[in-house]
């Protein structure tokens, strides 16, 4: 059987700021496995969210700040590919990579990496930014997010 393609979903253009990366280590819990003690595929979005939340917290975009600024950021696309099983009690790393976008959206690539370095899964999410009060999409990036994007362009997140 041919090897499935293991790729990045979003890529940067030459003039874009470098992606911002954050990793979270996690041990697969009993509540996260199926009857065969293998990580249940339905938990992968939760794993993605663990790394995503910490990455966004590090750059100053928390869910509390979204609410305070009237911003909604629902996931409108979620994709996952599975390459190797995670086993009960196994440690693994979830890697989130925020990739630059000029639009009012947030693009994040994910990798789930086993302790031995083997890639267990990859995925991505797309979040669209909208006005939380009238539920309409933002045509331009809202000021809170734009201020963080400006800091990103200025290179403030290189050492995260």
Specify the residue positions occupied by each region the protein language model found:
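Short hydrophobic alpha-helix segments
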Residues: 123-125, 141
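Residues in well-ordered beta-strands of folded domains
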Residues: 27, 81, 126-128
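Short loop/turn microsegments at loop-to-beta-strand junctions
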Residues: 107-108, 125-126
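Hydrophobic beta-strand-centered segment that forms part of the acyl-chain substrate-binding groove
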Residues: 55-106, 120
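Core beta-strand residues in small-molecule sensory/regulatory alpha/beta domains
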Residues: 111-114
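Extracellular and select intracellular beta-sandwich modules with Ser/Thr-enriched
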Residues: 22, 121-123
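A glycine-centered beta-loop-beta connector
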Residues: 116-118
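Hot-dog-fold acyl-thioester-processing enzymes
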Residues: 2-77, 131-160
């Amino acid at each position: 059987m041919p090897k499935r393609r293991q790729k990045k979903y979003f890529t940067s253009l030459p003039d874009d700021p470098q992606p911002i990366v954050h990793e979270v280590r996690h041990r697969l819990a009993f509540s996260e496995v199926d009857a065969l003690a293998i990580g249940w595929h339905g938990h992968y979005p939760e794993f993605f969210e663990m790394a995503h939340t910490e990455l966004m917290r590090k750059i100053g975009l928390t869910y509390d700040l979204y609410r305070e600024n009237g911003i909604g950021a629902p996931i409108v696309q979620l994709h996952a590919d599975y390459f190797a099983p995670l086993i009960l009690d196994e440690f693994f790393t979830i890697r989130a990579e925020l990739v630059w976008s000029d639009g009012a959206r947030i693009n994040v690539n994910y990798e789930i990496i086993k302790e031995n370095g083997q890639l267990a899964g990859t995925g991505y999410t797309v979040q669209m930014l909208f006005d939380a009060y009238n539920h309409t999409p933002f045509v331009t990036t809202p000021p809170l997010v734009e201020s963080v994007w400006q800091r990103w362009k200025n290179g403030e997140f290189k050492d995260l």
